[in-house]
Structure formats: structure tokens, C-alpha cells
């Protein structure tokens, strides 16, 4: 029995797509094919999938919402798992529990509907709840570490564990999940009671700021670089005269130099080449070495 036949038999009922182009699922609109793109409907299907992959020595990874990711043009080998069907969100008192595939922005709106404060900072951050925990996403002085109560994960060995914020060892755009290989299943956020109108005003203010400053009208991978201590990446790039600097179909945004936008059918290679060139030119200009925030995955073509 071939691996494909075994896969279809053992993983019967799970949505598996073979040789699926990933550019359709990426915010950058670039990326080659996944060998197997999988859409589990619940944690049990996810556990079955991970168990099968481990038994058959097939590599696997969770892509999240692909909002702060560049998938290389050669694609990704093995299983690529999209958890957007694991998207239930519930409210219990001042606590919100969200599955990993829940949309982060929509989760902040649920907090608003229940007059819960603490989540406003994330009201414009694209991506999934699981990806936000993985990266310790943050903006405007807030971050996931400030509100996370606990997190349920599937370990790389297929076991389910509950982790505290301390266990996750949060840092700037970092969590312990990045090293552990675990998959976020669900998250509990501890919020506080607030006033609906006040929360809405703050979310509207932050949304307006984001729309004003960020090139949301183009495909992009969000913030490309981490914030250097004592500086802003976008400012350093701008001071190096790189606004509008372009390689292939990808350019440094004129609106916000911390963003690289896909303006003309750019490729992942265009993104990588532009990122490397910007790092070198900023280093020459200011002596500061920028560090990537965006993750680059897969194989070159």
C-alpha cells in the first residue's frame, strides 16, 4: 500500500488536498505547493493527523493564518496544517476561550460585545489566535503575554498539555512554542470588565491609526523586522532612503517602510532578496543590524 493510499484510509474523513498551491492562503500571495494541505475540523482530527505523520516519518507543520509568514517558491514538504476550522470562541465571565484557528481580530470584537477590556491592542492584528500566541503578537503597548491565562497544546508527540503564561516564557515576538514544536489548540484570555463605549472608542482609534500608517491595500507579510532596542525598524529603513526600493515585484512601502508589499506578482525570492538587501543597506547607513520578525518557510525553487 502506498503512503497516499494509507493516508486516505487511516485519515478518512479529514480534508486533505494534494499538491495544493499555498499562495492562495498567504497574505503575501506568494508560495509554492504543499505536498499535503490539511484542514482538520477539531483537535481529534489534528491528533490523528500528527500521530499518522509521526508514524510514517512525514514532516508536518502548522501554518496558522499565514499573516506573518513567507512561503518559499518551492513550497513545503510533508503535511501543512491549516487550523482555521478550529475556530470556536466562548465567554465565561471575564475569560474568553478561543480555539487556535479563531480569527484574532474577530476575537477582540467578541470581547467588545461583552464589554471586556484588555484586548484592544490586538483589534487590527491579522492572523489567528494560535499564531498570535506563537509569536506573542503585540501592538500599541499591548501583547498576548499580558492577557494569556493558559494555553492548551498538542505536543509534537501527540499529547495534550495545558501551559501557563510562565510555561510559555514569553519574550518580544517569542514564546517557548517556537522551540518545543507543540501546536496551540486553544487559549484562555483573562480580561477585565469595562465600558462598551470606551472600549469601542479605543479600538476605533487604533484601527484608524493602523489604516493611516500601514499599506493595508496591498498583499504583505506585516511587520518584516523586529524593533531594534532604542529604534524603530521603519524609521531606520526610511533614513537609509529605502522607501519605494524594489526588487522584482516586491517593494518597501512608501507609506510605512517597515512593510514590504507585493505590487506586481512578486515571488518569495523577491521578498527574500529585498529583505537581505534592506538589512545590508541599513547596516551600512546606521551600523544597526535588523532582525527578521517574519518567518520564512519551505524550499527555494
Swiss-Prot record:
Keywords: Cell cycle, Cell division, Cell shape, Cell wall biogenesis/degradation, Cytoplasm, FAD, Flavoprotein, NADP, Oxidoreductase, Peptidoglycan synthesis. It is found in: Cytoplasm. Its cofactor is FAD. One of its GO terms (cellular component) is cytosol. SUPFAM superfamilies: FAD-binding/transporter-associated domain-like, Uridine diphospho-N-Acetylenolpyruvylglucosamine reductase, MurB, C-terminal domain. The active site is at 173, 223 (proton donor), 293. Residues 30-194 form the FAD-binding PCMH-type domain. Signal peptide: none annotated. InterPro entries: FAD-bd_PCMH (IPR016166), FAD-bd_PCMH-like_sf (IPR036318), FAD-bd_PCMH_sub1 (IPR016167), FAD-bd_PCMH_sub2 (IPR016169), MurB (IPR003170), MurB_C (IPR011601), MurB_C_sf (IPR036635), Oxid_FAD_bind_N (IPR006094). The keyword Lipoprotein does not apply. GO terms for molecular function: FAD binding; UDP-N-acetylmuramate dehydrogenase activity. GO terms for biological process: cell division; cell wall organization; peptidoglycan biosynthetic process; regulation of cell shape. It catalyses: UDP-N-acetyl-alpha-D-muramate + NADP(+) = UDP-N-acetyl-3-O-(1-carboxyvinyl)-alpha-D-glucosamine + NADPH + H(+). Pathway: Cell wall biogenesis; peptidoglycan biosynthesis. Its EC number is 1.3.1.98. Cell wall formation. Belongs to the MurB family. This is UDP-N-acetylenolpyruvoylglucosamine reductase. The gene is murB.
Amino acid at each position: 500500500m502506498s503512503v497516499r493510499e494509507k493516508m486516505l484510509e487511516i485519515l478518512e474523513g479529514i480534508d486533505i488536498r494534494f499538491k495544493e498551491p499555498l499562495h492562495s492562503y498567504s497574505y503575501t500571495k506568494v508560495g509554492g505547493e504543499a505536498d499535503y494541505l490539511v484542514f482538520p475540523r477539531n483537535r481529534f482530527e489534528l491528533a490523528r493527523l500528527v500521530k499518522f505523520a509521526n508514524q510514517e516519518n512525514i514532516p508536518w507543520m502548522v501554518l496558522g493564518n499565514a499573516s506573518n509568514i513567507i512561503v518559499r517558491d518551492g513550497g513545503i514538504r510533508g503535511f501543512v496544517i491549516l487550523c482555521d476550522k478550529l475556530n470556536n470562541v466562548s465567554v465565561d465571565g471575564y475569560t474568553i476561550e478561543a480555539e487556535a484557528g479563531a480569527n484574532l481580530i474577530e476575537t477582540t470584537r467578541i470581547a467588545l460585545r461583552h464589554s471586556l477590556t484588555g484586548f484592544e491592542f490586538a483589534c487590527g492584528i491579522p492572523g489567528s489566535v494560535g499564531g498570535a500566541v506563537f509569536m506573542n503578537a503585540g501592538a500599541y503597548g499591548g501583547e498576548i503575554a499580558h492577557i494569556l491565562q493558559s494555553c492548551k497544546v498538542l505536543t509534537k508527540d501527540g499529547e495534550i498539555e495545558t501551559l501557563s503564561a510562565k510555561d510559555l516564557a514569553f519574550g518580544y515576538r517569542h514564546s517557548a512554542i517556537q522551540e518545543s514544536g507543540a501546536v496551540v489548540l486553544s487559549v484562555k484570555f483573562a480580561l477585565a470588565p469595562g465600558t462598551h463605549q470606551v472600549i469601542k472608542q479605543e479600538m476605533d482609534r487604533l484601527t484608524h491609526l493602523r489604516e493611516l500608517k500601514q499599506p493595508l491595500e496591498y498583499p504583505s507579510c506585516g511587520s518584516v523586522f523586529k524593533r531594534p532596542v532604542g529604534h524603530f525598524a521603519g524609521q531606520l529603513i526610511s533614513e537609509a532612503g529605502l522607501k519605494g526600493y524594489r526588487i522584482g515585484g516586491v517593494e518597501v512601502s512608501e507609506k510605512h517602510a517597515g512593510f514590504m508589499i507585493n505590487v506586481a506578482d512578486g515571488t518569495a525570492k523577491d521578498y527574500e532578496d529585498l529583505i537581505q538587501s534592506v538589512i545590508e543597506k541599513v547596516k551600512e547607513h546606521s551600523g544597526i543590524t535588523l532582525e527578521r520578525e517574519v518567518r520564512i518557510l519551505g524550499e527555494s525553487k
